[in-house]
UniProtKB/Swiss-Prot annotation:
Family membership noted in the UniProt record: Belongs to the immunoglobulin superfamily. ROBO family.
Effect of residue 639 to A: Does not affect binding to NELL2
The keyword Transmembrane helix is annotated on this UniProt entry: yes
Domain Fibronectin type-III, first and last residues per copy: 558-652, 671-766, 771-869
Protein name: Roundabout homolog 3
Pfam family name, one: I-set
Spans through the membrane: 892-912
Record's compositionally biased regions (Low complexity): 1067-1083, 1178-1191, 1202-1229, 1345-1361
Stretches assigned to the Cytoplasmic side: 913-1386
Basic and acidic residues composition bias: residue spans: 1294-1304
Subunit description: Monomer. Interacts (via Fibronectin type-III 1 domain) with NELL2 (via the EGF domains) with a 3:3 stoichiometry; this interaction promotes oligomerization of ROBO3 resulting in the repulsion of commissural axons in the midline.
Encoding gene (name): ROBO3
Signal peptide residue numbers: 1-20
GO cellular component annotations of the record: axon; membrane; plasma membrane
Amino acid sequence: MLRYLLKTLLQMNLFADSLAGDISNSSELLLGFNSSLAALNHTLLPPGDPSLNGSRVGPEDAMPRIVEQPPDLLVSRGEPATLPCRAEGRPRPNIEWYKNGARVATVREDPRAHRLLLPSGALFFPRIVHGRRARPDEGVYTCVARNYLGAAASRNASLEVAVLRDDFRQSPGNVVVAVGEPAVLECVPPRGHPEPSVSWRKDGARLKEEEGRITIRGGKLMMSHTLKSDAGMYVCVASNMAGERESAAAEVMVLERPSFLRRPVNQVVLADAPVTFLCEVKGDPPPRLRWRKEDGELPTGRYEIRSDHSLWIGHVSAEDEGTYTCVAENSVGRAEASGSLSVHVPPQLVTQPQDQMAAPGESVAFQCETKGNPPPAIFWQKEGSQVLLFPSQSLQPTGRFSVSPRGQLNITAVQRGDAGYYVCQAVSVAGSILAKALLEIKGASLDGLPPVILQGPANQTLVLGSSVWLPCRVTGNPQPSVRWKKDGQWLQGDDLQFKTMANGTLYIANVQEMDMGFYSCVAKSSTGEATWSGWLKMREDWGVSPDPPTEPSSPPGAPSQPVVTEITKNSITLTWKPNPQTGAAVTSYVIEAFSPAAGNTWRTVADGVQLETHTVSGLQPNTIYLFLVRAVGAWGLSEPSPVSEPVRTQDSSPSRPVEDPWRGQQGLAEVAVRLQEPIVLGPRTLQVSWTVDGPVQLVQGFRVSWRVAGPEGGSWTMLDLQSPSQQSTVLRGLPPGTQIQIKVQAQGQEGLGAESLSVTRSIPEEAPSGPPQGVAVALGGDGNSSITVSWEPPLPSQQNGVITEYQIWCLGNESRFHLNRSAAGWARSAMLRGLVPGLLYRTLVAAATSAGVGVPSAPVLVQLPSPPDLEPGLEVGAGLAVRLARVLREPAFLAGSGAACGALLLGLCAALYWRRKQRKELSHYTASFAYTPAVSFPHSEGLSGASSRPPMGLGPAPYSWLADSWPHPSRSPSAQEPRGSCCPSNPDPDDRYYNEAGISLYLAQTARGTAAPGEGPVYSTIDPAGEELQTFHGGFPQHPSGDLGPWSQYAPPEWSQGDSGAKGGKVKLLGKPVQMPSLNWPEALPPPPPSCELSCLEGPEEELEGSSEPEEWCPPMPERSHLTEPSSSGGCLVTPSRRETPSPTPSYGQQSTATLTPSPPDPPQPPTDMPHLHQMPRRVPLGPSSPLSVSQPMLGIREARPAGLGAGPAASPHLSPSPAPSTASSAPGRTWQGNGEMTPPLQGPRARFRKKPKALPYRRENSPGDLPPPPLPPPEEEASWALELRAAGSMSSLERERSGERKAVQAVPLAAQRVLHPDEEAWLPYSRPSFLSRGQGTSTCSTAGSNSSRGSSSSRGSRGPGRSRSRSQSRSQSQRPGQKRREEPR
């Protein structure tokens, strides 16, 4: 409290002194205050406080001293700031801060204060507070450090807050400037402290200064000369410590004055030609363009300003000359560009020279006045001469020719040699024009004709090292001289390899490859010259020389003198005759012409002429011509015909200028056509291409000529093309398999140009299009079975190539008599052997090339004569035997025969197997017979409409075996029957003793004709010998039932039916019915065991398929047995048929049963089912059975059960002492393994039975059987009664067949059979009937019935007392795998 009071007083004192202003220095004020308050401190402070106890000053204490002075600060609003201050002293001084002389409150003194005093003495501002009205943090701050010795004050430090306003005092504005002009953007930043700096941004990027072009001064942006790239959005940026401010964006638009990308240029054009002035400009904004003509207007109706701003003027004339200007304007400027137009007018004749006739020694003058722009130059020239006559030219040495400045030609002292055409030519840059006039000398003759070459060089193909003679015989007046050129170059006379003879022939010795080329013979005289050319080529096929022609080896004779038949102003028609006396045949003609006005040489005006008349076209009007004709043959050209009489063409209009007819020909002669390699496009088609060099403006078309190359040199076929730009064509229809020689000439208005070098190309071969000629057949000398066929090749035009072979066919009336043979291409005959005498054959021959066989010839019929000692049929038969022997030796026949034999054997084996199987099944059926009581089952499902019996093989039969067997209807009552067995002895282990499928199918077959269930017979018999049993049609379910376990012998028919029943065909019984002995009931079956014992032996029932309930029951015994009167034989009772006929009727049992002795009627008791008895296999006694007693009720049950069948304690007293059977079950088609599974047999015909037959009179989906179980099979060893029958010779045929089948089956491998022990099943012999007691007949089921017959699961009644226990026991017992059944003899 005292300290707070002192501090308060100190602050009040300081504040009062500052207001009074007496003391200027705060440090002095504080010292005075300290000294004045020393006594007060001494009295008020505690005596132990050394800081204010002046009487206890230590020697090391010191007054405060400011070590670190606070600096001036410039901070931003809202930002933190720190004023440092550090002091030294002893004791450590306290730091205080004053603002503008007032004490600064910190958080230590006032929690509401926003300033902090740091331990180092610095004053910290977490956030500078600054507003327009309140500025609490801005001011002058002083740091004071004090201890008891005194106080020290720091320098005054100012704290200022930086400020920058938002509004620019002047924002930049938009600027529009042209390219190259300066631009200025002004900007005045907003107010702020400190004063903000200014920078610029262009399109969001900082703008940098460019030396000399872009500068920033005082906030202004200045560009000395703008560029197109300077256009954009500019922003002025003002910045200081308080931040940055951006102005509104200002756009700088840099426009572009019009500038020319393409300027119009000066042009010079011909009159009537179009002209185009180009003008392309650029600018921003796009400039507008317009055209104007200096000192005039644009030609109305003849100009057009197109979309690209170019100026087009059509059909210009001299008046259109001038300067044309393109003007481009936009908002920032204007530009102009000009081009001049000069129109040249070709020279034109003002005065036309006229033809004149003068006598020798006279003077003549030819006028030739012209005009044009620019003015043309005029000169004269005589045709055929190289001398040019110009105006003002000095006179010739003769002094007879001169040209005036106006273009007039003067000739003085005309001579005979001055005759001819004189040409006036006017030439300027705009073109040229010529006019000619004819000077005729009176009395002139035709002695001055140019030389004529009688025989010139021909085209030749040579081999290296040979010698060649190139002839050149000439004639003329005066006699011409002969010189030779090779490839356009003169041959030197000193060359030793080339030698020119006196008659002009050129001799070349030891020809080399360098000597090949184009040779020309030139005959020259004072009257003119003539040229003849030919080429030499090297032969490629050295060893093959072409066959010489068969014609005379000399050229054709000279034709007759041509005669003029028709004259026009442009054409002359000539006619001549050939010379048939000498030389080779004429293939064509060549026509040459000479005109004194056209030059001093003969020119070819037509070639390849086929007829003896021709019209020469393309001639000049009013011109004299002379003609001669040559014939062309295989050996070259003939000598020329006599020269025709001079003929003048008709005159044309005199006002029309005459043009030079031969000047164009001279220009065409300079046009070089180079033929390229032809391309084969397809059959008979070539593409020909060429290039042209020289004055192409004279070319108006081309002539393409081709022919078949060869020594004969066929005629040329010509194709004229009228387009000068076309330099390729397609030749079609060329003969295949030949060499085609091709050449090309340029065509002009004046005629044809020089020929190109010919090119040869091969055409692909084709099959001959024609048959061989002259096919003939002659009998051969090689016996009577051969002929000789001869022929000639097809026509040359139909061969289509080189014949490589001939195909000969000799066709008989059947294909087996056909013969064919091939012969070489050079052959003309062939012999065919092996013909059958007496047969008519057709013989054909066809030629073949590499492309295929051609058209065959017409058939030629031939028939060989038969020998006189044999008839025609025998001869043919002998031929057939030979051919049959050949066929039998063919591998294909042998293979086919083997395959057929194999298939036949397989079919035979299958038939035998099927037959044997049928015998087995029928024998089973024959051996079985049934007496079954007609009992209706209320719960039966899926049964036939003719029966209400349960499905066979499923449930135990509710009745005991009947006492005696049913005698066969055909048996005598007095016949002696052995007792103890009803089946044949020695049964096969694989055999079944009942026919499930047969009886079921028979029931299905006869079900339609039977009565209702209630009307059926009580007992039925099965007659194996009856006719009805011989036709069993199978009606099997399409899907077999599931696995029935080891009791598949009671399975539905489809599981046991063999191949014999697959198709539902008839089954033929081969055996005879067996007479069965009668047995007594007590001898055959023991009494049943008690129900308590049977309940312990129940087996699994769930495996039985087709049942709707999981349990079985035994139906009650009938109240009375339907017995018939006993037969006279004793012991056998005959059941009367409903219709009183002995024929068999539908039976509902599959195995033999005896008649049941009637018992007194008792109320029906609930039956006790014994399913385990169904699973007990039967035992077979080793010897003949003795009569059985009732004390053995469990006689069919195995003594040693498998793992799946547990024997209860009550079952052992009733087991039979006979040996146990083997493990394998006797069910056909399946084998019972010891683990309780069924394995399919090796041969399985089931898959074939799944297809439903067409006729299904009877079908059960879920009924495994309708009949009682089969009888027990006999033992392996024959019973005593069977031995007695065998000894008595009474064995039936069926027994004998079965005995044979058993022997055959023994050879079958064990894997395909059911391996059975001879003692596998127990055979229960029938004995005389005995009667059961009432309790035995009503309370229990029959033992044999339990073992061999099971009631339908769908017709079960009430359940016995021990059913659930027995079913669970059967499940547990059947699930013990791996335990095999073993049978050990007891």
